[in-house]
């Protein structure tokens, strides 16, 4: 049920935090850890449950499961689980770097937040992203950023910690929003080959994904009106 699910999530987050404290986690692991922490705080407030108490209860649930779990069953479970991969266009420095906007524009699309600097004009821009992949398809966006040729960050798409969960289509639509807003100011935008491959399952030499017609004008107007 909802309470026991929250308790198990709290304990598993605690285990992952201990792992991170040993400096064993990579960038996607640490990013998910931070986002999940914010999500757990929100769920704690909604359910009226103390996180520390829930963590102890979650530990007891997990221990009971492990006591009943045979090694053979565990091997079969692991073998049948789909394998995730984590393509990384951006370095840790590019992901963690602070950036500022002269003319900030922001739009919330479902569980994704789209931000861009509309003071940027006549630039060549590339979209890079770090994300998880399952069955050769983008599963979860960790972070997407728009970079100029000089390396400046001028746009971003990030999941909202308070609204976890998004689909491949959500990500593609958000990318369309961002491209439309940037191209409104005569910037030339291309998408990294890695992102094209796993989001659209295609690769275009010009770096342009197959966005629906009129999306550029529509999305640019939407971003302008909603902020």
UniProtKB/Swiss-Prot annotation:
GO molecular function: protein serine/threonine kinase inhibitor activity; RNA binding
Motif Nuclear localization signal: positions: 31-35
Chief place where the protein resides: host cell
CPSF4-binding as annotated region, ranges: 177-212
GO biological process: symbiont-mediated suppression of host cytoplasmic pattern recognition receptor signaling pathway via inhibition of RIG-I activity; symbiont-mediated suppression of host gene expression; symbiont-mediated suppression of host mRNA processing; symbiont-mediated suppression of host PKR/eIFalpha signaling; symbiont-mediated suppression of host type I interferon-mediated signaling pathway
Compartment list: Host nucleus; Host cytoplasm
Spans annotated as PABPN1-binding: 220-227
PTM note: Upon interferon induction, ISGylated via host HERC5; this results in the impairment of NS1 interaction with RNA targets due to its inability to form homodimers and to interact with host EIF2AK2/PKR.
Pfam families: Flu_NS1
GO cellular component: host cell cytoplasm; host cell nucleus
Keyword set, alphabetical order: Eukaryotic host gene expression shutoff by virus, Host cytoplasm, Host gene expression shutoff by virus, Host mRNA suppression by virus, Host nucleus, Host-virus interaction, Inhibition of host innate immune response by virus, Inhibition of host interferon signaling pathway by virus, Inhibition of host PKR by virus, Inhibition of host pre-mRNA processing by virus, Inhibition of host RIG-I by virus, Inhibition of host RLR pathway by virus, Interferon antiviral system evasion, RNA-binding, Ubl conjugation, Viral immunoevasion
Motif range (Nuclear export signal): 134-143
Membrane-spanning parts: none
Domain of life, per lineage: Viruses
SUPFAM superfamilies, sorted: Ns1 effector domain-like, S15/NS1 RNA-binding domain
Region of interest called Disordered, as start-end residue ranges on this chain: 202-227
Domain notes: The dsRNA-binding region is required for suppression of RNA silencing.
Main function: Inhibits post-transcriptional processing of cellular pre-mRNA, by binding and inhibiting two cellular proteins that are required for the 3'-end processing of cellular pre-mRNAs: the 30 kDa cleavage and polyadenylation specificity factor/CPSF4 and the poly(A)-binding protein 2/PABPN1. In turn, unprocessed 3' end pre-mRNAs accumulate in the host nucleus and are no longer exported to the cytoplasm. Cellular protein synthesis is thereby shut off very early after virus infection.
Subunit structure: Homodimer. Interacts with host TRIM25 (via coiled coil); this interaction specifically inhibits TRIM25 multimerization and TRIM25-mediated RIGI CARD ubiquitination. Interacts with human EIF2AK2/PKR, CPSF4, IVNS1ABP and PABPN1.
The name this protein goes by in its record: Non-structural protein 1
Encoding gene per record: NS
């Amino acid at each position: 049920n909802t309470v026991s699910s929250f308790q198990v999530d709290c304990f598993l987050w605690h285990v992952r935090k201990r792992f991170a404290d040993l400096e064993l986690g990579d960038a996607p692991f640490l990013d998910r850890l931070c986002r999940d922490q914010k999500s757990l705080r929100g769920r704690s407030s909604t359910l009226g449950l103390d996180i520390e108490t829930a963590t102890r209860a979650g530990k007891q649930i997990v221990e009971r499961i492990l006591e009943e779990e045979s090694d053979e069953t565990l091997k079969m479970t692991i073998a049948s689980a789909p394998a995730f991969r984590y393509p990384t266009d951006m370095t840790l420095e590019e992901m963690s770097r602070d950036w500022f906007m002269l003319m900030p524009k922001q739009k919330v699309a479902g569980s994704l937040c789209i931000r861009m600097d509309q003071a940027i004009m006549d630039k060549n821009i590339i979209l890079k992203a770090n994300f998880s992949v399952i069955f050769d398809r983008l599963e979860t966006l960790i972070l997407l950023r728009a970079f100029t040729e000089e390396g400046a960050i001028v746009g971003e798409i990030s999941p909202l910690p308070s609204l976890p969960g998004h689909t491949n289509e959500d990500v593609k639509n958000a990318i369309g929003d961002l491209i439309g807003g940037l191209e409104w100011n005569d910037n030339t935008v291309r998408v990294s080959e890695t992102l094209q491959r796993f989001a659209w399952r295609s690769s275009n030499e010009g770096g342009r994904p197959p966005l629906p017609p009129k999306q550029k004008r529509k999305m640019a107007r939407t971003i302008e009106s909603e902020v």
